């Protein structure tokens, strides 16, 4: 037997093969006895050999012993299990492991049995199965994300939400200056809240939507136009209280820390005078979230998941909570608008060219000091290795430098992409 370069010699008797000599001798004696006595006697006197008779080779083969030998002596000794990809500390890459190989016992039993029956082909190349490289664990990915934040020397608050759209497995990470925080931090939503505005608007848009409404949605998402956002809410929701309808829609979906409390135009009033949420009620962390619009990465990520499930499968929370108000075709339109938001930075910057992403980003300059303090981006990412939701929000009370923030986003996005596409990194 050959297992790759390893040669194993084995006695047939040790693996359950033996000749059935008794049966063959009996068959030969029966062939002799079948000849007429006097004919055989005179042939013997004149030294004449009797005619030959074919006696079939008979054997006994215990395939259970063959299997046992292969499993306990060969596979146990020579099989090599696969080793997973390993994270490269502080980088966005993974080091390839070894796929390993194992004995295909069922196929090898057949091959060995055939060789035992053959008088000529007495050697066997055992059948092997090449393993597959396994993906690192979610915990290893979480550690890599923390290391990337450290390498980028970002000392403010970072919260990341990622969900596998195939399995539903998710990852939540809240981090600040080497310290792990409890996820669910309130961040200024900025323009990411326009995802919620879009979902709410479609509750009240009758199909087919008018060209005017379609244009407003496109400009709100693809161009992040605040004027169009206010116009959409006035046109479809309510001329004054449209933002409150957005908040009610989010609460109906169970997203209790995501809200919009005013229009986007400068000087717009707070409609509720301030909204208290589970996230902004925390006293262990404060990102100074905008009182007009807030969210947490988990909730904006879950909202994107709802849109995806609605568009992809015609199911999910949107259709369950708002039956008859939102349709699968409308969800597909939402994703189309999100994919038109092409900016080449933040999460998008970490993706290879040609990768499809539907996302909404948001940031603002503080009018008091003229600095940027918070950035958010949340999107649906479609890749060969799997589709996922990724939401990343960051805050720094001192200042966020755009170039540094974009590099951090690109690195965090890239490591998640590589995690799903290990063979192409």
Predicted regions and their residues:
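Flexible glycine/proline-enriched surface loops and loop-helix/loop-strand junctions
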Residues: 50-52, 178-184, 213-214, 225-233, ...
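Structured C-terminal helix/loop/strand segments within mature extracytoplasmic catalytic/sensor domains
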Residues: 292-295, 302-425
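Surface-exposed, secretory/extracytoplasmic low-complexity segments enriched in Ser/Thr/Asn/Gly/Pro
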Residues: 1-179
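Short, well-structured active-site flanking segments
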Residues: 203-219, 224, 242
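Active-site SXXK
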Residues: 185-208, 220, 390
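Surface-exposed patches in mature extracellular/periplasmic domains of secreted proteins
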Residues: 80-85, 121-127, 157-162, 207-217, ...
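Active-site-proximal beta-strand/loop segments in catalytic clefts of secreted hydrolases
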Residues: 163-165, 175-177, 201, 221-224, ...
């Amino acid at each position: 037997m050959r297992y790759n370069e390893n040669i194993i010699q084995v006695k047939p008797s040790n693996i359950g093969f033996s000749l059935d000599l008794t049966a063959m001798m009996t068959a030969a004696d029966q062939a002799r006895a079948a000849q007429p006595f006097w004919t055989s006697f005179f042939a013997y006197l004149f030294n004449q050999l009797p005619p030959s008779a074919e006696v079939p080779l008979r054997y006994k083969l215990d395939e259970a012993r063959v299997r046992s030998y292969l499993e306990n002596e060969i596979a146990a000794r020579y099989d090599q299990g696969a080793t997973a990809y390993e994270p490269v500390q502080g980088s966005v890459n993974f080091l390839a492991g070894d796929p390993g190989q194992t004995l295909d016992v069922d196929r090898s039993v057949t091959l060995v049995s055939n060789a035992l029956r053959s008088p000529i082909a007495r050697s066997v190349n055992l059948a092997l199965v090449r393993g597959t490289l396994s993906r690192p664990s979610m915990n290893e990915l979480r550690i890599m994300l923390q290391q990337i934040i450290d390498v980028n020397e970002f000392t403010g608050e970072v919260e990341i939400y990622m969900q596998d759209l195939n399995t539903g497995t998710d990852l939540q990470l809240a981090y600040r200056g080497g310290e792990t925080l409890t996820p669910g931090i309130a961040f200024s939503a900025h323009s990411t809240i326009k995802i919620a505005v879009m979902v709410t608007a479609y509750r009240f848009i009758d199909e087919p939507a008018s060209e005017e409404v379609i244009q407003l949605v496109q400009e709100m998402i693809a161009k992040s136009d605040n004027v169009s956002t206010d116009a959409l809410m006035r046109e479809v929701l309510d001329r004054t209280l449209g933002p409150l309808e957005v908040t009610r829609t989010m609460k109906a979906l169970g997203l209790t820390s995501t809200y919009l409390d005013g229009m986007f135009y400068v000087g717009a009033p707070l409609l509720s005078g301030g909204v208290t949420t589970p996230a902004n009620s925390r006293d262990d962390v404060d990102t100074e979230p905008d009182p007009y619009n807030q969210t947490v990465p988990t909730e904006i990520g879950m909202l994107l998941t709802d849109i995806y499930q609605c568009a992809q499968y015609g199911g999910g929370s949107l259709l369950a909570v708002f039956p008859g108000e939102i349709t699968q075709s409308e969800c597909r339109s939402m994703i189309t608008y999100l994919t038109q938001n092409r900016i080449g930075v933040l999460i998008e910057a970490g993706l290879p060219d040609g990768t499809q992403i539907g996302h909404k980003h948001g940031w603002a300059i503080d009018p008091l000091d003229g600095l940027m303090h918070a950035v958010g981006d949340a999107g649906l990412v479609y890749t060969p290795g799997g589709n996922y939701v990724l939401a990343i929000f960051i805050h720094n009370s001192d200042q966020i430098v755009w170039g540094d923030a974009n590099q951090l986003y690109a690195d965090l996005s890239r490591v998640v992409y590589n995690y799903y596409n290990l063979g192409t990194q």
